[in-house]
């Protein structure tokens, strides 16, 4: 399989040395933690993540996958040659965000009526 080419900048610019601000610089946009959530719940491919109920636009999903890979939160491996398609998995650094996602779920269930976790039907 051909290697995945990363055409993005080598580093993400951080606003300050504050750990909270720096973390938000990496994953604080509207979509990144939802991609992490989907990977935590077993989704692996672009198409699987794209079908999530929030309706992430295709260009945004491609950008977030590339950015999360660039900062070491996810990694990709080609599973098909023509056309080349990738499966995504969380790195140990990415799996460490599981507690953050869980904290958001707990907060939402407590403070936003009608919300639930993905595992609840």
Placement of each model-derived feature along the sequence:
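N-terminal helix-turn-helix DNA-binding core of bacterial DNA-binding proteins
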Residues: 18-60, 81, 89
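Amphipathic alpha-helical dimerization/coiled-coil segments
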Residues: 98-121
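N-terminal leader segment of winged-helix/HTH proteins
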Residues: 1-27
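Short loop/turn motifs at secondary-structure junctions and domain boundaries
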Residues: 14, 79-80
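Basic amphipathic alpha-helical segments that dock to polyanions
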Residues: 61-71
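Basic, amphipathic "hinge/linker" alpha-helix immediately C-terminal to the N-terminal HTH DNA-binding motif
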Residues: 28, 80-103
């Amino acid at each position: 399989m051909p290697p995945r080419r990363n055409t993005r900048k080598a580093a993400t610019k951080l606003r300050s040395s504050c750990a909270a601000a720096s973390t938000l610089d990496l994953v604080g946009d509207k979509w990144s933690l939802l991609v992490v959530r989907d990977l935590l719940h077993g989704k692996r491919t672009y198409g699987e993540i794209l079908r999530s109920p929030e309706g992430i636009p295709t260009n945004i999903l491609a950008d977030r996958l590339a950015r999360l890979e660039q900062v070491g939160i996810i990694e990709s491996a080609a599973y098909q040659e023509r056309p080349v398609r990738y499966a995504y998995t969380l790195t140990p650094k990415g799996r460490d965000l599981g507690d953050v996602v869980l904290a958001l779920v707990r907060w939402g269930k407590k403070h936003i009526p009608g919300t639930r976790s993905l595992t609840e039907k």
